Amino acid sequence: MNSNLKLNEDETFEKVSELKIGNYVDCVFNKCDLNNFNLANFSFSQCEFIDCNLSNCDLKNTKLAEVSFESCKIMGVEFGVMNQFLIKLSFKECNLSFSSFYQMKLKKTWYMKCELEQVDFTETILSES
């Protein structure tokens, strides 16, 4: 967690289309449209994204620790540029088409009933996924 950023804890965000840079802990994002949004340097810990559009988001140096995505559209996202320290993700019924997980270590990552058309898993470690 970046101590210089605002802490947002135990909050629910409904149908938002932008977020302020910060640390988000135990938050729920429901039906948010963050298509093409710059999430660089954000931090999300123990958060849930439900029915959100995160397509083409910039995740440069973004932290995702124990984050779940359900029924989300996450197309064309470059996950490999994230901060990969303590990364733990799960995806259920998401569209991840045209995204890239190039050279990531994604042990025990769940991809349940997801659309994965032309996803780049080159040199990705997916053991126990």
Predicted stretch roles:
Residues 1-129:
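Tandem repeat scaffolds
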